Amino acid sequence: MATPLKLYRNIGIAAHVDAGKTTTTERVLYYTGMSHKIGEVHDGAATMDWMVQEQERGITITSAATTCYWSGMDKQFESHRINIIDTPGHVDFMIEVERSLRVLDGAVVVFDSVAGVEPQSETVWRQANKYGVPRIVFVNKMDRMGANFLRVVSQIKQRLGSTPVVLQLPIGAEEEFKGVIDLIKMKAIHWDEENKGMTFKYVDIPADLKATCEEYRAHIIEAAAEYSEELMEKYLEGEEFTEAEIKKALRHLTITNKVVPVFCGSAFKNKGVQAVLDGVIEYLPSPTDIPDIQGVDEHGDEIHRKTSYDEPFSALAFKIATDPFVGTLTYFRAYSGILKSGDTVYNSVKGKKERIGRLLQMHANSREEIKEVRAGDIAAAVGLKTVTTGDTLCDQDKVVILERMDFPDPVIAVAVEPKTKADQEKMGIALGKLAQEDPSFRVHTDEESGQTIIQGMGELHLEIIVDRMKREFNVEANVGKPQVAYRETLKQAVEQEGKFVRQSGGRGQYGHVWLKIEPQEPGKGYEFINAIVGGVIPKEYIPAVDKGIQEQMQNGVIAGYPVVDVKVTLFDGSFHEVDSSEMAFKIAGSQCFKQGALKAKPVLLEPIMSVEVVTPEDYMGDVMGDLNRRRGLVQGMEDSPAGKIVRAEVPLAEMFGYSTDLRSATQGRATYTMEFCKYAEAPTNIAEAIIKKQ
């Protein structure tokens, strides 16, 4: 029997790298009856982490999609179908998080009660804001030394700028953590240890916590009163709200991103996870609660699709994975209509038809074959040929292109070569497949040295790629030293003439252009404007000029790095009836750009990383001194239970080998995280050294 749409929840579980997200997901699968034995990350047996590298490293890399059913702790709901996308918390895999947020309706964000809101949590939060994803928070690890629930709540307010509404308070903390208090029911919940928390009982609130509970319940009532005028009147007249009224109000406020309900517990100790599942059903949206999906039709006009089985089919492919048994799996989210296996769909981004063979639904790494996928659901199709991440699949007669996802450019590159000649071809195939799965990973061949260069979002990202080549494709590779992906840009506007003329018997070559080259704001990218009037250059030659400029931009003008953020206007030129050709105009455009760019104050840009170091106070001086030596700019400092937190912006070029240096400077007691922040102009002495090397 198909589940009605209002009983669906498509959610992600997102968190910082060690907040205990995979353990939380595992418990969800256990309590919803999908897995009969609890898998622990510590034993390398977690169901969701199904790539060998994940089990070894104890972190989650691929986001697996899993389906489970839940009808409430007290069996108080109809059976709801929850699709969970497990997302990695390590910043090198931010792209995976970004992709999954794009197709989710809601998220559970897990925080560690000791570490609180960490830098990656802020990144995930910003990404969720960007896609307008409603969320609830689970403050996990309440049994750890130094657990402090209310500190995390105040960080959500201050660091993330959100409005948390506390729905539960912990009973005790650290070793003494016993259970939680439900502030809406005003009852304490104790989970039974014998059956891993499968059953629980409501008891009265401990006397010493009564006053605190009253105070936090008052905050909930205050928040709920904002929902409607009736509730506001009740509130002002001091009348009690019913449980249903509070929940209805909070649901609306959560879905519209005005508040964030906060739960607490310890997944590892089997306390609190079922209450979070109830929260998913009560406060997170179903596919019918979210706005209609927007897209454009083949003429570029905006169109909407409702989440309904009666609309034409549309879906977004959000992940490609290579499965050892079935080949290429394309994970997609269906937004409208119904897709049956055997149907033909249209990939509107690539303009190609695809026949859908088998359709699968995933439970971590086991799979179930299904006959159809309906609007609002998440599934995987086997063996699609042309689909890459971010493509739209739709009805052939009712074409729609859903919005594209934008992926960041890689910031780090290394050269790889196979250990044996025999592996050369295998390596090419392996890298091709991995690049198809992961849009933030690029592969190209360096034209001068003939080396294969792989680029990604960080050292760990590339290490894992090399590791996967070895594991999944049996290709052993030697890896060069990491190289920074520099860029070039221009600081001044210039006008430049470019002429390419060859006369040597027979047909000649003639191309002549005038370009205005000007800098754009950082991040604006390249823009080409055709301002030719009166046909001084025939329009069939214009694209060739654009192509010539872009090729020259790829090759750089001062140090061979790509030129970015430039606007080029083609405003004049001339042609020859016989000798002009696309080739001649392409060369003219390319040469003209190079000559002009050299006069336009070209500069070198380097990637700057946001670095956050957590260090015991004793080593603070050494850490700061070291960051300054690495050309770092300290942005701020604050206290945390683990010592001091230092935030700085440091050029990537200075950060290689930092983990080893930091370990030795602090006897292994400091930790750091880093993520890409922006490109900035490199100081003259640094730029000169890099240009000389080229």
Swiss-Prot record:
The keyword Glycoprotein does not apply. GTP binds at residues 15-22, 86-90, 140-143. It holds the Pfam family EFG_III. GO terms for molecular function: GTP binding; GTPase activity; guanosine tetraphosphate binding; translation elongation factor activity. Keywords: Cytoplasm, Elongation factor, GTP-binding, Nucleotide-binding, Protein biosynthesis. It is found in: Cytoplasm. One of its GO terms (cellular component) is cytoplasm. The keyword Magnesium does not apply. Residues 6-288 form the tr-type G domain. SUPFAM superfamilies: EF-G C-terminal domain-like, P-loop containing nucleoside triphosphate hydrolases, Ribosomal protein S5 domain 2-like, Translation proteins. It comes from the Bacteria. Gene3D superfamilies: 3.30.230.10, 3.30.70.240, Elongation Factor G (Translational Gtpase), domain 3, P-loop containing nucleotide triphosphate hydrolases, Translation factors. Its main location: cytoplasm. One of its GO terms (biological process) is ribosome disassembly. CDD domains: EF-G, EFG_III, EFG_mtEFG1_IV, EFG_mtEFG_C, EFG_mtEFG_II. Belongs to the TRAFAC class translation factor GTPase superfamily. Classic translation factor GTPase family. EF-G/EF-2 subfamily. Catalyzes the GTP-dependent ribosomal translocation step during translation elongation. During this step, the ribosome changes from the pre-translocational (PRE) to the post-translocational (POST) state as the newly formed A-site-bound peptidyl-tRNA and P-site-bound deacylated tRNA move to the P and E sites, respectively. Catalyzes the coordinated movement of the two tRNA molecules, the mRNA and conformational changes in the ribosome. This is Elongation factor G. It comes from Legionella pneumophila (strain Paris).
